[in-house]
Amino acid sequence: MKKSFLLLGAMMLLVMSTKAQKYNFEDYIYPFGCRTYASPDSKGNLSSVTQYSFESQAFDNYLIEEVYIGLGMMSAKTTYRYRTEENAVISDVQLRQNRLTGSTRYQDKLILFAFPEKDKPFKWSETDRGDKYQCTSEYVYINASIYHKSLFMKAIKITRDNSYIVGKEKHRILETSYWVSNYGRIITYVDWDGTKKASSKLDILDYVQEISEEEYNKLKK
């Protein structure tokens, strides 16, 4: 009987370990929480700096986003309560604080990060403060320069697509982020009605461009 319990315990531990190892969140999320991001203005000059960190309170985990402007003055802070569920990091409560508008608490179900499925993109829909987004996570290949070193890497590309109408005019906002193992999110682009710019960039990133799998295999050699 004792051997049966030990065997059952070992099998349960193996199953738990297999599930835990299926998605390596620590390779993408924890590096992201230790990085500094620069946001340029329309002329390419530094507009603000964003820093991320993690906190645990009681049995809850939080991702803290702090935006600084000027001489180190905090202009906004967002606290995301989050959990991991299957292939995604999900926030179910957000506390948004702004120096001008005060604090507002939201309970939107937002996916902060998601792994693609093994052989196809992972897709979902979400509502962020009343705006509806169609989202996709997929594997792509990139050439990026980090710390002035050119690297060819497999990355996760996450897009959030929001189409809306003002009056009779149609508008579209497309957010595109690239995530890399051991670095987290390295850059986010925002395309507003066809005008694309980098809205948030890892401070150690020099450049990044998406390449084909054929180019990746050729250049990686």
Question: What are these language model-derived features?
Answer:
Residues 21-221:
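Conserved functional acidic sites
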Residues 1-25:
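Bacterial Sec-dependent N-terminal signal peptides
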